[in-house]
Every structure is written in structure tokens, then in C-alpha cells.
Amino acid sequence: MKCTSVLPNLLVGSDPRLKDEFEELKSRKVTAILSLQTDEDRGEGGIEGERTAAREAGLAFSSVPVEDFNRADLRISLPVSVAELDRLLKQGHTVYVHCTAGVNRSPTVVAAYLHWCLGVELLQALIHLHACRDCLPDAEAILGARSSDATEPHTP
């Protein structure tokens, strides 16, 4: 698991799979996980397996499944994903946002959060994420979601 701090209360990276990785998140003061993976991404046990592992580690868990390598699904899911991230942060959590590799979906959600919720210029949000970790946040998905009327949340 590769985990990178973006803000003191916001981390991004790849999916935790092992008990030690959930414990590492706790040692980094993470109190909540936002997973963008689908059941197919997780494999055996699916999202519920991760939810159980997070709970066993004492971490809150939220899931907004986003299909990997699907810009349209990412664009449609961004408003819901960002709203869930914002909700967790406003509750005082330190949040770990992850997808499978931590390269596209999770950095895109974090960049959109920085831009939409914190007012960071999109280019600056992207530059900041690139400085934090090797990743490819999807600026086109963010720009498309901003003007879309997609408001229906995905069901976990």
C-alpha cells in the first residue's frame, strides 16, 4: 500500500489489503476510509470484506464505487464522492481516500475536493497532487462533473 499525505487530515493512495496496512493507516492518524473501488476491484470478499477489516481496525468506512478506467463513471460519481469526503472531513475525521493503485480515481476525487470545497484553483490542485505522489488525476472528468447535472449517488 502506497499512502501519501495531501493535507494533514487527508491522505490518498492504493487499497489496503492486509491487517498490517489497516494498522499503518491508524498509526498515521487515519480515522476513516473512503473507498472508490468496486466489488470487482476488491475480488474475494468485495467491499464488505474491506468494510469489515476497517471496522476491526477501528476505522470508519465509506464506499462510493467508481468503475476503473471509465471517465464517464468517474465524472458522474465525482459530486457524490466529493460530498462524502467533505462530510467525513467536516465530522473531524482524518480520511484515507483510495482506489486500487491510487493513481487515477482517488487523486481525481481529492483534486476535485481541493478545487470545489477549498477553492484551490484546479491547476494548483493538480500540481499539488503531482508534487505529493505520482498520479494522473483526470482534469477533464472534474471539469465535466462541474457542469453536469449528475446528482444521483451510486449505491454501495
Mark where each language-model region is.
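A phosphate-binding catalytic loop at a beta-strand-loop-alpha-helix junction
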Residues: 92-111
